[in-house]
């Protein structure tokens, strides 16, 4: 990016402002992308202040991509969810050289690379190697070269809009440069804080009498999630681009290394510590080379990342679960320290898992002060022979989650105490049970336990469960934290005045949620069973239970032998179901749902008897929008009553159930003389099956 040859005089404010913007952006590019600063800080500040003055005097000269627009705007009330057009996937991890060798072998096998008789790869795969930054993954969207949106990774599918905060980061260009500008480009990368900037930030915090940050990652995370972008603007954040989401209007580079080279031509900051290597030997050489220089790098990293370089080979390998087969994160060994174990408590997770947690004398390890560490499970405590009072080795696994590695036996005091797993949940008093062949003990009060409350409510409301539209995690958080909802049954007591009192919950949202709760009262037995959140009981098992028993009470009272007769239900699943219904707290909530909530479903006779009633063997077609039921809920109710639900109308169709905005299916039914029912008429047919 060349320096502007002619400096316009102050008497020409439009030209002067344009020149100042170009000069400041050129200086940013030289500093952050080229790492070759050529403008002293004082001179940069002088030009910046001059541009601010001109734009204040001539507001019509302000442009969206002006460097002055990075300083932050009004405080936001919250972060808006953003659904990623292309998921931001996580990577599989490797911790040892053997993991890398195995990864290379899997990749070579997947690409049908040549091997010798001993199985050694003789046609090495080409990889792109990069650093794994210890920061926050984000996605930047550019449209026609202009920055328009930034979002966090979130759960990989949905993140949060942090556009105004990202706009304040000088390393990120607001306008792309170069000739190959795409119509749309999602840049994936990492927001981080350099070590020198972190040290200066903590100096400022100390001088202001404010709390210091534990490490650069925490500082970056806290800065990026500020509701007031002015605070973010005051924090020294940086950025490196390393991946891509959506691309439209330009050709995708053939290689990953080519992508990063292209990014540099667009003015995006890309880390120079990268290489293209061949085979496992090349991967390990890069890893160990970086490891030797890790402490001298100007930023924190927790490993390196390997990616198959050729794009066509990446496509051939594809993905498994939520991670690509063509990439691996190779983590550095975690850092360790010695401290004293003061006590062992148990923690109840969102799914009821009981985890022993070590309470420690504070120790600084892996860049953070650690006072608690996981002991994983009861078996691990026994295997490692860890006792209260021991001196223990603490490790930050993956540099994030502290764990107790082992006890230092020659320092064990005479009064060291063995850990005993409690028999009752510390949160709700329900029984703690451990299934055969499982390492994790669990609280059995799934519908009642406060620690599991949010997870139970969230699962209960899922689309494949009772499908309560509008009951998202943030609303559940408020309902639980304000003690408005303790169990799923309490949802059906929520009133309009209660809902509109929630933070950022308008009248329309309240009415929609109440309508959704009303619709949720009419469900199917299979959906209801699935909604209970019984461990090991997914949609398929819930349907098998409903089909086998026909109604809920026989399932609740079934002994393990009877449960084992259900299709695909083995000993572990049967024991889990039996334990769930044996817990009186769960039975109480179920009765409240049936009585207070009036949740109903069509019931049928137990298998193997054929479905009875007017819909047995009948073919029904659904069309339009029903007043209280979703299409999926209506379909399941009809199928539970023995009907076959078809997607198109023909002479073999017995009934058409039509709602609002019914289209060609309704017209064809009328043409063929097929009986047309509304939702009320459908319920009339189902009366012989309803509770």
Curated annotation (Swiss-Prot):
This protein's name: DNA ligase
Broadest EC class assigned to this enzyme: ligase
Entry-linked CDD domains: BRCT_DNA_ligase_like, LIGANc
Gene Ontology BP annotations: DNA repair; DNA replication
Keyword NAD among UniProt keywords: yes
Presence of keyword Zinc: yes
Gene Ontology CC annotations of this record: cytosol
Domain BRCT: 610-691
Coiled coil: none
Reported cofactor(s): Mg(2+); Mn(2+)
NCBIfam families reported in the protein's UniProt record: dnlj (TIGR00575), PRK07956.1 (NF005932)
Name of the coding gene: ligA
UniProt family annotation: Belongs to the NAD-dependent DNA ligase family. LigA subfamily.
Annotated positions binding NAD(+): 41-45, 90-91, 130, 153, 190, 307, 331
Annotated organism of origin: Burkholderia pseudomallei (strain K96243)
A Gene Ontology molecular function term of the record: DNA binding
């Amino acid at each position: 990016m060349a320096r502007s040859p002619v400096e316009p005089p102050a008497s020409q404010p439009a030209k002067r402002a344009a020149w100042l913007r170009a000069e400041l952006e050129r200086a940013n590019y030289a500093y952050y992308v080229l790492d070759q600063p050529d403008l002293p800080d004082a001179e940069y500040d002088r030009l910046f202040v001059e541009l601010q003055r001109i734009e204040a005097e001539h507001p019509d000269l302000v442009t969206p991509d002006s460097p002055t627009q990075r300083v932050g705007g009004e405080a936001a009330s919250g972060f808006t969810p953003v659904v990623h057009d292309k998921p931001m996937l996580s990577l599989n991890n490797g911790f040892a050289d053997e993991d890398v060798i195995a990864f290379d072998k899997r990749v070579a096998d997947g690409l049908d690379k040549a091997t010798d008789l001993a199985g050694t790869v003789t046609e090495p795969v080409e990889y792109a190697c990069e650093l794994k930054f210890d920061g926050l993954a984000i996605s930047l969207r550019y449209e026609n070269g202009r920055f328009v949106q930034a979002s966090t990774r979130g759960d990989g599918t949905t993140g949060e809009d942090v556009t105004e905060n990202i706009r304040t980061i000088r390393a990120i260009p607001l306008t792309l440069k170069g000739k190959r500008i795409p119509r749309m480009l999602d840049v994936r990368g990492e927001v981080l804080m350099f070590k020198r900037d972190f040290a200066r930030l903590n100096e400022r915090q100390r001088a202001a009498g404010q709390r210091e940050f534990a490490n650069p990652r925490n500082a970056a995370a806290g800065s990026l999630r500020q509701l007031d972008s002015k605070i973010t603007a005051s924090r020294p954040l940086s950025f490196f681009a390393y991946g891509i989401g959506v691309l439209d209007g330009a050709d995708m580079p053939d290689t990953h290394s080519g992508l990063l080279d292209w990014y540099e031509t667009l003015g995006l900051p890309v880390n120079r510590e990268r290489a293209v290597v061949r085979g496992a030997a090349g991967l390990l050489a890069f890893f160990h080379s970086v490891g030797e220089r890790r402490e001298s790098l100007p930023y924190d990293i927790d490993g390196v990342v390997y990616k198959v370089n050729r794009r066509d080979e990446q496509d051939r390998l594809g993905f498994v679960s939520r991670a690509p087969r063509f990439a691996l994160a190779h983590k550095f060994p975690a850092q360790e320290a010695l401290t004293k174990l003061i006590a062992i408590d148990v923690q109840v997770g969102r799914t009821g898992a009981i985890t022993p947690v070590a309470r420690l004398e504070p120790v600084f390890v892996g860049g953070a002060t650690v006072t608690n560490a996981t002991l994983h499970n009861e078996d691990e405590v026994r295997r490692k022979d860890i006792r209260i009072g021991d001196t223990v080795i603490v490790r930050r696994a993956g540099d994030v989650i502290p764990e107790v590695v082992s006890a230092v036996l020659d320092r064990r005091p005479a009064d060291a105490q063995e850990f005993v797993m409690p028999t009752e949940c510390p949160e709700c008093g329900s029984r703690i049970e451990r299934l055969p062949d499982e390492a994790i003990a669990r609280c059995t009060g799934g519908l009642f336990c406060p620690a599991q409350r949010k997870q139970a409510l969230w699962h209960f409301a899922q689309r494949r469960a009772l499908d309560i539209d509008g009951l998202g995690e943030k609303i559940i958080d408020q309902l639980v934290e304000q003690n408005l909802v303790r169990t799923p049954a309490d949802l059906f007591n929520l009133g309009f005045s209660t809902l509109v009192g929630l933070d950022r919950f308008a009248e329309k949202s309240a009415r929609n949620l109440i309508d959704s709760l009303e619709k949720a009262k009419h469900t199917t037995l299979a959906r209801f069973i699935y909604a209970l959140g019984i461990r090991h009981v997914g949609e398929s098992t819930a349907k098998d239970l409903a089909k086998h028993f026909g109604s809920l009470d026989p399932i609740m009272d079934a002994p393990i032998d009877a449960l084992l007769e259900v299709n695909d239900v083995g000993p572990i699943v049967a024991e889990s179901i039996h334990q769930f219904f044996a817990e009186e707290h769960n039975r109480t909530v179920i009765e409240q749902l049936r009585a207070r909530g009036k949740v109903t479903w069509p019931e049928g006779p137990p298998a193997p008897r054929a479905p009875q009633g007017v819909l047995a063997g009948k073919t029904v077609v659904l069309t339009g929008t029903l007043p209280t039921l979703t299409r999926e809920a209506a379909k399941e109710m009809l199928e539970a009553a023995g009907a076959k639900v078809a997607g198109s109308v023909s002479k073999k169709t017995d009934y058409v159930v039509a709602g609002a905005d019914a289209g060609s299916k309704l017209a064809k039914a009328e043409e063929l003389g097929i009986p047309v029912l509304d939702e009320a008429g459908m319920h009339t047919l189902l009366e012989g099956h309803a509770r």
